[in-house]
Amino acid sequence: MYDIDEIYYDAIDLLKAMVAVPSFSREEKAVADVVEQAMTKFGLCPKRYANNVWCQSQDFCPDKPTILLNAHIDTVKVAEGWQHSPFAATEEDDAIYGLGTNDDGASVVSLMAAFRALTTMPQPYNLVFLASAEEEVSGKNGGEAGLPMLPPIHFALVGEPTNMQPAIAEKG
């Protein structure tokens, strides 16, 4: 079983750590290091290609379908008009402000939390969690570059801020 409070506070701490590290597209090494270290701390077995970091359920079985949980770790450059420091992870009124908290750090930590909780018990499917790079620029070393290293994926859930409106999309 798992401790939901522990997973919750770990997610908050990880989000703050991610915000504190500039992670502009094609410059994600430091934040990929943060995510990889967190995975290791949480008892996961991270793998890495460039700045893409992933792990899979420890009871992975090739006979079961595989679900991918994916969110990106890169951000756009800092624009003008910030009311809080973009790298300070400021907590105010039950919210955390900082560059990348919404797009897409909250998805990264939420999907990693779901992965951690779901992999503590037997499932009829495999899980893979991927924190991908270069999404903001559709870069050649982003998630697409890491996909060939993953097991065959049958279904993917991609975290991206859509104002709570489900979206279906593909490129190509």
Segments (PLM) and residue ranges:
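Fold-level recognition of mixed alpha/beta catalytic cores in primary-metabolism enzymes, strongest
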Residues: 106-113, 119-172
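N-terminal helical capping/dimerization or prosegment-like subdomains
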Residues: 1-70, 75-78
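A generic structural signal for short coil/turn motifs at secondary-structure boundaries
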Residues: 26, 99-100, 166-167
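Short, contiguous, pocket-lining structural segments
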Residues: 31, 103, 170
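Fold-independent oxyanion-binding glycine-rich loops
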Residues: 49-51, 71-73, 101, 132-134, ...
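Active-site metal-coordination/substrate-binding segment of hydrolases
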Residues: 64-128
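A generic local structural motif
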Residues: 5, 41-42, 53-56, 84, ...
